[in-house]
UniProtKB/Swiss-Prot annotation:
General function of this protein: Displays oxytocic activity on rat uterus.
GO CC terms, sorted: extracellular region
Subcellular location: Secreted
GO molecular function: neurohypophyseal hormone activity
Similarity comment: Belongs to the vasopressin/oxytocin family.
Protein name: Phasvatocin
Alphabetical UniProt keywords: Amidation, Disulfide bond, Hormone, Secreted
S-S bridge residues: 1-6
Record-listed Glycine amide modification sites: 9
InterPro entries found in the cross-reference section: Neurohypophysial_hormone_CS
Domain of life, per lineage: Eukaryota
Amino acid sequence: CYFNNCPVG
């Protein structure tokens, strides 16, 4: 995850 973006848990 990056800051606020989590495409794949």
